[in-house]
Amino acid sequence: MNRLQVELPGLSLKNPIIPASGCFGFGREYAQFYDLSVLGSIMIKATTEQPRYGNPTPRVAETPGGMLNAIGLQNPGLEKVMNSELPFLEQFDLPIIANVAGSQAEDYVAVAKAISKAPNVHALELNISCPNVKTGGIAFGTNPEIAADLTKRVKEVSEVPVYVKLSPNVANIVEIAKAIENAGADGLTMINTLLGMRLDLKTAKPILANRTGGLSGPAIKPVALRMVHEVSQAVNIPIIGMGGIETAEDVIEFFYAGASAVAVGTANFIDPFVCPTIIEELPALLDELGFDHISECQGRSWKQTCHSR
């Protein structure tokens, strides 16, 4: 029995560990360190219809317990992703989750329609929550009606299940999650980065050229856990949880909160082996906690019927 196997819409995962979009590129660099087939899946970097060069530098700044980034969805564009990046990943035994982004609804629809046809793309991650772009991005993820409409339009053209990435920069994330579920989303991924800023002590000006950036890393884990805990009780579609995950213990916490799988982001920059290390350590942690299968942990913080053996 594979104690870590997880079944989600469109995704048969040998384990629930997925490198998060934006922190793993298209896997090429990490493939030099280990066989990517050990992973549950990969969320590739956000793809837009046309190439994007991102925001001006500086666009990364360290913070206590994390980092700020304002990359701005830099990517080579749909054509290169389809003709080069996705074919490269075909050598690995794992389903790919394609992250879809755009400036307007038509952009999302065009990318989703094309990229969902790729043979190794088993699901889409609809990026309606990037805080670092002037148009699109978070603008689609902070209004329930707009988020639902975009979800519905993408679902109509996608050939694979659609997961929607939620922004934490909202007043009521449950309301938005339910609107997206009602629009036909197959799952949710959460959370994206929190909007933040750093100032230069000598100039008193923002360190990032974009002024603000997305905060990620261990600092946001408590916020992410709280939001997964709230949303998982309000919807009936699976959640891929993310936000500050660095260890096997972090993974179990997200499962307790209600996640069905997890994505590891910023930690990949610190330790390129973090994902395989977590995968290796999870079985022993399940033994220590008294679980036969990782699914027994799902929603344990609020499901009264969940018991360890």
Swiss-Prot record:
Keywords: Cytoplasm, Flavoprotein, FMN, NAD, Oxidoreductase, Pyrimidine biosynthesis
Sites where the protein binds FMN: 21, 45-46, 99, 127, 165, 191, 217, 243-244, 265-266
InterPro entries on file: Aldolase_TIM, DHO_dehydrogenase, DHOD_1B, Dihydroorotate_DH_1, Dihydroorotate_DH_1_2, Dihydroorotate_DH_cat, Dihydroorotate_DH_CS, Dihydroorotate_DH_I
EC number(s) per entry: 1.3.1.14
Active-site feature positions: 130 (nucleophile)
Pathway in which the depicted protein is active: Pyrimidine metabolism; UMP biosynthesis via de novo pathway; orotate from (S)-dihydroorotate (NAD(+) route): step 1/1
Subcellular location, record wording: Cytoplasm
Chain segments annotated as coiled-coil in the UniProt record: none
Recorded family membership: Belongs to the dihydroorotate dehydrogenase family. Type 1 subfamily.
Protein name (Swiss-Prot/TrEMBL): Dihydroorotate dehydrogenase B (NAD(+)), catalytic subunit
